[in-house]
Amino acid sequence: MTSKQLKLVIITGMSGAGKTVAMQSLEDLGYFCVDNLPPSLLPKFWELMKESDKMDKIALVMDLRGREFFDSIEPALDELDNTNFITTKILFLEADDKVLVSRYKETRRHHPLEPNGSVLDGINAERELLSDLKGRSQLVINTSNMAPRELRERINNEFQTEDKDVFNVQLMSFGFKYGIPIDADLVFDVRFLPNPHYIDKMRPLTGLDEDVYEYVMKWPETQTFLDKLVDLLMFTLPFYKREGKTQLVIAIGCTGGQHRSVALTEFVGKAIQQKYETTISHRDMKRRKGR
């Protein structure tokens, strides 16, 4: 039996306050997420998680959809408090009555406590029933004035670990003749640069070979472009991260994806990885190698 420590976040609170956004944010942070687990199943669930080597961060959404919620949530939490291998944090999301009513009207949903009655009556009943749980929560967030992006940013600030940057930049070279990568967020065309393909000895090589790399890099327009591109990315990447993105795919393309785009992708990747977790790949480099 393993003695590892599990981190548990219980997401709860008012219906319509943003629990789904919170769960998605924690999932992006590497949490194993379960939506609407009945409280009575918590002890068995913990034992299973404790035996897993792949799960050490868990987030559970627990709310009124669980019919036994109010009867069993308090005993389940008391049992967790006495469990030495789990560190528990309760995240309680709330919003003002006026805001919750407005959100229900926008989505045309009924309140779970008043499926055939007044939304406001359901909100008032839910708020009263959740008052004790709110009191024992370690983190309470009022989302009345928050857009989903702002809630994601708040969740990231509260829960991301210091030893892991959850924002990953993927640099990819490609050849336009084979199509633009469908998963690219940003695409840069470097076909304006001198092409080593027309030099016989370089034709079978790639941008990873020293001769090709130096040839591509020697041109003033290459250096000017790289200076501007790296500057642009260093300026914009923090804002993509702020928007809640956990991954950004940047594609750099030339004609065949063998020479220019490969060399520039290597250069840009090495510059970006000084600050961000970065993955470098060359989609089309081997298609023509040796021909």
Swiss-Prot record:
Matching Gene3D superfamilies: P-loop containing nucleotide triphosphate hydrolases
InterPro entries linked to this entry: P-loop_NTPase, RapZ-like, RapZ-like_N, RapZ_C
Binding of ATP, residues: G13, M14, S15, G16, A17, G18, K19, T20
UniProt-listed NCBIfam families: PRK05416.1
Function: Displays ATPase and GTPase activities.
Family to which this protein belongs: Belongs to the RapZ-like family.
Name recorded for this polypeptide: Nucleotide-binding protein LMHCC_0126
